[in-house]
């Protein structure tokens, strides 16, 4: 019974982030087929980089908790864990914004203003009121 209640029909399946971005680039920015192909290639490279970073984050989190446990959650161990986590978050943010810049570099001069004004809306669109 629980499976039936919580199973979503295929027609309402969520669109992947990649597909949403492709639609944005095609419909809002005006990408052509060659530009979309460049984006696809860039996406694959970015996805591999993010996977490596996420694996590193998981390993780092495990290590942080081990160090915290072994030290009895000392102030210095907590500070070290915070510093490691912050550095990993900086790397993730850097990868994200570098990818946006690389996508922007695929745009021609006419498309760049549309990308610049639309990208924030793409990532931070307001929820519709119910």
Per-region residue spans from a language model:
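Extracytoplasmic/periplasmic/luminal assembly and interaction segments
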Residues: 17-84
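Classical N-terminal targeting signals for secretion and organelle import
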Residues: 1-17, 127-130
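Non-cytosolic head/periplasmic domains of membrane-anchored proteins
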Residues: 41, 62-130
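Proteins with a high burden of low-complexity, intrinsically disordered sequence enriched in S/T/G/P/A and R
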Residues: 1-2, 30-32, 37, 108, ...
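Extended, structured, electrostatic nucleic-acid-contact surfaces
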Residues: 9-28, 96, 100-101
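A short, ordered amphipathic alpha-helix with a cationic face
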Residues: 10-15, 51-55, 87-92
């Amino acid at each position: 019974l629980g499976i039936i209640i919580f199973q979503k029909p295929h027609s309402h399946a969520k669109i992947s982030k990649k597909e949403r971005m492709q639609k944005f680039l095609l419909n809002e920015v005006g990408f052509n087929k060659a530009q979309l192909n460049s984006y696809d290639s860039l996406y694959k490279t970015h996805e591999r980089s993010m996977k490596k970073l996420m694996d590193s984050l998981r390993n780092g989190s495990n290590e942080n908790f081990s160090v915290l446990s072994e030290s009895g959650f000392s102030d210095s161990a907590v500070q070290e864990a915070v510093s490691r986590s912050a550095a990993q978050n900086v790397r993730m943010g850097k990868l994200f914004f570098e990818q946006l810049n690389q996508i922007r570099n695929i745009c021609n001069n006419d498309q760049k203003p549309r990308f610049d004004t639309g990208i924030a809306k793409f990532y931070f669109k307001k929820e519709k009121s119910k």
